[in-house]
């Protein structure tokens, strides 16, 4: 059983019922039936901005319910230092490097995303499930 880190974009597609991507995200998650899915506080932040900004309480509750089903991973300072190195080496955006560093730090077997830029820096850890 592997530990799989989920990028916020995939949760957004699934929870908000994106017409093109929701079913593909669900299928990708279902194909990993023996895995434990994990997120960081950064994923929560990214997911909750829209419903908080728009005041959409129903959407906020859907996010909170979905996020609460996932394993929360802490983000100690070492993750931020690793993210700085990744940003310096690969030129990725700070949130992307934090996701990757968190997955690496916690020994995740995969980081699922739709972000092609992360694949090179991830050295096989990152999988774009929407290709």
Predicted feature residues:
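Conserved glycosyltransferase catalytic-site signature
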Residues: 8, 41, 96-100
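Acidic catalytic patch
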Residues: 17, 69-89
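Acidic, PIN/NYN-like endoribonuclease modules and their adjacent C-terminal/linker elements
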Residues: 1-3, 70, 100-131
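A generic structural signal for short hydrophobic patches within well-formed alpha-helices
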Residues: 11, 44, 80, 118-119
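Short, well-structured N-terminal submotif of metal-dependent ribonuclease cores
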Residues: 1-39, 51-62, 116, 130-131
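Active-site charged/polar residues at nucleotide-handling catalytic sites that mediate phosphoryl
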Residues: 32, 90, 106
């Amino acid at each position: 059983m592997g530990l799989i880190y989920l990028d916020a974009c995939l949760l957004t597609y699934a929870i908000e019922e994106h017409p093109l991507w929701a079913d593909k995200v669900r299928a990708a998650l279902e194909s990993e039936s023996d895995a434990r899915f994990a997120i960081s506080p950064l994923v929560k932040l990214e997911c909750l901005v829209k419903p908080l900004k728009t005041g959409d309480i129903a959407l906020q509750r859907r996010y909170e319910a979905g996020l609460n089903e996932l394993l929360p991973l802490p983000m100690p300072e070492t993750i931020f230092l690793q993210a700085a190195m990744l940003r310096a080496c690969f030129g990725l955006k700070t949130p992307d490097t934090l996701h990757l560093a968190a997955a690496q730090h916690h020994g995740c077997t995969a980081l699922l995303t739709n972000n092609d830029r992360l694949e090179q820096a991830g050295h096989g850890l990152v999988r774009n499930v929407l290709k």
